[in-house]
Design a protein with these regions (language model features):
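Amphipathic alpha-helical interface elements
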Residues: 1-114
Length: 114
């Protein structure tokens, strides 16, 4: 599962680097974090929720996907990732697995280059 989440994060990072300028990236983080942002590598999964939620930034992507659906999936996958990183012992639910694979399918459609 972590490999799929890593692929999703890499695709988000690549899209952010290709479509957004540094100010867009900094605008997606809290004020106390702005100075550490140099490129999309420095964004957390949670920052992508805020980055993609903004209508103007969404438009810059040029993705023909439903913005609300993508943002919802990014937020759900962020939570799955956090659960995994904190060594959750419960098996991954079908809903969580579906969120990860659903986001990855959308990202592969929007940004087909691996």
């Amino acid at each position: 599962m972590s490999v799929l989440i890593e692929e999703a994060e890499n695709r988000l990072r690549r899209a952010a680097d290709e479509h957004f300028d540094l100010q867009d990236l900094k605008d997606s983080v809290a004020n106390h974090q702005k100075s550490r942002i140099k490129d999309a590598y420095h964004l957390t999964f949670g920052n992508y929720v805020y980055l993609l939620r903004d209508a103007d930034r969404w438009h810059k992507l040029g993705w023909r996907l439903d913005q609300d659906q993508v943002v919802d999936l990014v937020e759900r996958v962020k939570n799955v990732r956090n659960d995994l990183m904190h060594f959750a012992t419960d098996p991954l639910s079908e809903d969580k697995f579906a969120a990860v694979t659903g986001l990855l399918q959308l990202l592969r459609t929007a940004e087909p280059n691996p």
